[in-house]
Structure formats: C-alpha cells, structure tokens
Amino acid sequence: MTHQHPYHLVDQSPWPLTGAISALMMTSGLILWFHINSTILFILGTVLLVLTIINWWRDIIREATFQGFHTLSVSNGLRYGMILFITSEVCLFFAFFWAFFHSSLAPTIELGVSWPPTGITPINPFLVPLLNTAVLLSSGVTVTWAHHSILSGNRVEAIQSLTLTVFLGVYFTILQAWEYFDSPFTIADSVYGSTFFVATGFHGLHVLIGTAFLAVCLLRLYNFHFSNHHHFGFEAASWYWHFVDVVWLFLYICIYWWGS
C-alpha cells in the first residue's frame, strides 16, 4: 500500500553502503597490491562488489517486473538518470583523451621530441586493434537487431541476437587481453604507456560491465521479463553498449592509428 502513486520513492536498501565499502576495499587493495604485492583486500572488495551488484539488480528486477513499481514516470526518471550517467562517462574519457593529446601534440625533450617516444614500438593498428574494431562494431549491429526483435515481439530472434552480442563482447575482451600480454611496451614506459593502458584499460573495464549488463538482460529475456512496451533494462544496456562502441572508435583512430 506504500506505492499507490507514480513516483520513484526507493525503499531502504543496504546495497549503496556495501557498494561504497567495496569501492573503498578495492582502491585500498590496489594500493596494497602496488606497494606490498598483497591482493587479498582487492579480491575481497571485488567479491563484495559482485555480491552487491547481484543483490541490487535482483531488487530492481523484482520492483520492475513483479511488483509493478516502474510506472511511466519512474521509467522516464530512470531514462534521464541513464543519460546523465553516460554523460559523466563521456567526461571521464574526455580527460583521458586530453592527457593523450596534451602529451602527443607537443612531446617534451624527455620523450625525444617525438611521438611515439624514442624507444617505444607502437602496436600495429591494422592487426588485433582492427579486428577488435570489427568485433565491437558487429556487436553494435547485433544489439540493435535484438532491440528491434523485442519491439516486434520476436523473442527467438531477440535471444539469438543478444546471445551473439554477449559472445562478441567476451571475444573482444579476450583479444584485448591477448594484445596486452603481447604488447612491446608496458604502463611504466613513459607517458605513452601510461595514457595507452589507462585509456584502453578503462574502456576494457566498461566492455566487461556492458557484457555483464547484456548477459543479465539475456537471462531476463529467457525468463519472459521483457515485453515490446516494457524493456527499459535492455534499452539502458544497449545505450551503454553503443557508448562503448563510439569510445572505441575514438580510441582506435586517435591512439592506435594516429598515435602510432
């Protein structure tokens, strides 16, 4: 009886607190990992974060699908929230590109007054990075196919296309990890290595998050949680995935191709 209104008034929840604690544990764990080579706190923070995400998303799915709390007004509010979240992510990556161009457009004498810096062998942009570009752009096509299938009520094609999208996301992550292990330079190799691994690493983290987001949507699709007029969870995931696609295009053009 407490929800006989169209507004988004959330119930008391422990998950923001556990999420904040997990973030503190992970950042503190990273510091310990860097300085004393101990990964225990980082792993515990990661486990707590995963448990928080599982339980928080479970509660949201329960509210949206089974309790009917996600009215039109609530859905519109969630849309605005997702748009603002993606905008904040744009600002995050803008900072990485700023750092890259600040260093590359006017390389200092310590770098040999050249870009890439003297002694750095860049990754060939027409090998694994080009394949990764094709993989990620293909996943953008398949997630759009899934969206249109949901809108038209074609559940079978929606499941097929979303499964393919998740597979392409996992494949991209494997290729990126392979590229890192095979890289001729490290994050410690001047500002070139720092900007390269921070920018592409954060993008890879976003691909992992987006893949998890889409995998949850696939599970919900199997369980008949989406209809052609009520599927904002999938819409939010697809927006996020398209954002990841666009960021990769800028990374490929600026850092891999022009930066090499």
Curated annotation (Swiss-Prot):
Q: Name one Pfam family in it.
A: COX3
The protein's matches in InterPro entries, at most eight in alphabetical order, are given as:
Cyt_c/ubiquinol_Oxase_su3 (IPR024791), Cyt_c_oxase_su3_dom (IPR033945), Cyt_c_oxidase-like_su3 (IPR000298), Cyt_c_oxidase_su3-like_sf (IPR035973), Cyt_c_oxidase_su3_a-hlx (IPR013833)
- Its EC top class is translocase
Q: Does the keyword Amino-acid biosynthesis apply?
A: no
Q: Tell me the CDD domains matching this sequence.
A: Cyt_c_Oxidase_III (cd01665)
- EC number(s) recorded for this UniProt protein: 7.1.1.9
Q: What keywords is this UniProt entry annotated with?
A: Membrane, Mitochondrion, Mitochondrion inner membrane, Translocase, Transmembrane, Transmembrane helix
The biological process GO terms on file are:
mitochondrial electron transport, cytochrome c to oxygen
Report the catalytic activity. 4 Fe(II)-[cytochrome c] + O2 + 8 H(+)(in) = 4 Fe(III)-[cytochrome c] + 2 H2O + 4 H(+)(out)
User: Which sequence ranges are marked TM in the entry?
Assistant: 30-50, 81-101, 126-146, 158-178, 196-216, 239-259
Domain of life the protein comes from? Eukaryota
Where it sits in the cell: the answer is: Mitochondrion inner membrane
- Any one GO cellular component localisation term in the record: mitochondrial inner membrane
Keyword Cell inner membrane part of the UniProt annotation: no
How does this protein sit in the membrane?
Multi-pass membrane protein
GO molecular function terms here?
cytochrome-c oxidase activity
Which family is it part of? Answer: Belongs to the cytochrome c oxidase subunit 3 family.
Subunit structure comment from the entry: Component of the cytochrome c oxidase (complex IV, CIV), a multisubunit enzyme composed of a catalytic core of 3 subunits and several supernumerary subunits. The complex exists as a monomer or a dimer and forms supercomplexes (SCs) in the inner mitochondrial membrane with ubiquinol-cytochrome c oxidoreductase (cytochrome b-c1 complex, complex III, CIII).
- Function recorded in the entry: Component of the cytochrome c oxidase, the last enzyme in the mitochondrial electron transport chain which drives oxidative phosphorylation. The respiratory chain contains 3 multisubunit complexes succinate dehydrogenase (complex II, CII), ubiquinol-cytochrome c oxidoreductase (cytochrome b-c1 complex, complex III, CIII) and cytochrome c oxidase (complex IV, CIV), that cooperate to transfer electrons derived from NADH and succinate to molecular oxygen, creating an electrochemical gradient over the inner membrane that drives transmembrane transport and the ATP synthase.
Q: What is this protein called?
A: Cytochrome c oxidase subunit 3
Organism of derivation? Pisaster ochraceus (Ochre sea star)
